[in-house]
Amino acid sequence: MKKQRKNNTEKMKNKKISWLAKAVYAAAAILAVAPTANAMHIMEGYLPPAFCIAWGIVCLPFLVFGFRSLNRRVQENRRSITLIAMAGAFVFVLSSLKIPSVTGSCSHMTGTGLGAILFGPCAVSVLGIIVLIFQAVLLAHGGLTTLGANCFSMAIAGPILSWLIYKGLSKTRINRRITVFLAASLGDLFTYCVTSVQLALAYPSAQGGVTASAVKFLGIFAPTQLPLAVIEGILTVVVVIALESFAKSELKAIDFEIEEEKE
């Protein structure tokens, strides 16, 4: 009797997880047919060839370690595939939402904070570059020549900061939800800071050089990106709460500490 109840409970949990995953994938499918726009990703052909090659080389070690990390997790526990796929879909959905800025540019959330919290920054680099390739080829969002630069800012630099913030604050008495919020939102903002520096290095200002140029690019992104970072932080907290409610066994399988257990 107890075994039957346990099986029924497990089936209910799997149904809830499946429903959550389907909801994320449905949103991704809807956004896949959205009209294109000039967004935060550095567009095709915008960077000089030398910069494209350099940023691509910088990304390679992270991608290698990330692939090994994901492969190891899947080999250790096949059930982690669901969370990995969900984290990737979360990146795609949020990074496809293009919000026009009053400065004439567009901004969007990154969604990489969730994956960094669950799997670490290197693993997110793989998820991020898959999303970036898909967006560049099918949505005209970003570009293949600028793939290295976009990958470094969105899928490497931002997730690293998110992971560091999460790990650092997790050792304190700060509430878990606040920790997740800060990790996701500040990681999002840092992505735009890195993008601004990348553009400034390629196109320094005639007066003030790289620093002045970076400040100008930051000024273009800031009006929309600041509120978007807050929204991303809130959405990430909501997803983590949902996972802690419906996917406890999957979270334990990847050694993620559940809030109630921490308390």
Where are these regions (language model features)?
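Hydrophobic transmembrane alpha-helices
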Residues: 36-114
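Membrane-helix interface motif
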Residues: 34-38, 196-208
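Hydrophobic cores of alpha-helical transmembrane segments in multi-pass inner/ER membrane proteins
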Residues: 55-64, 155-165, 230-241
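Hydrophobic alpha-helical transmembrane segments
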Residues: 53, 81-86, 125-129, 152, ...
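N-terminal secretory/membrane targeting signals
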Residues: 2-39
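Alpha-helical membrane segments and adjacent membrane-interface helices in multi-pass membrane proteins
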Residues: 95-158
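C-terminal transmembrane helix-loop-helix hairpin of multi-pass membrane proteins
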Residues: 179-189, 209-263
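Short helix-perturbing small/polar motifs within transmembrane alpha-helices
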Residues: 153-196
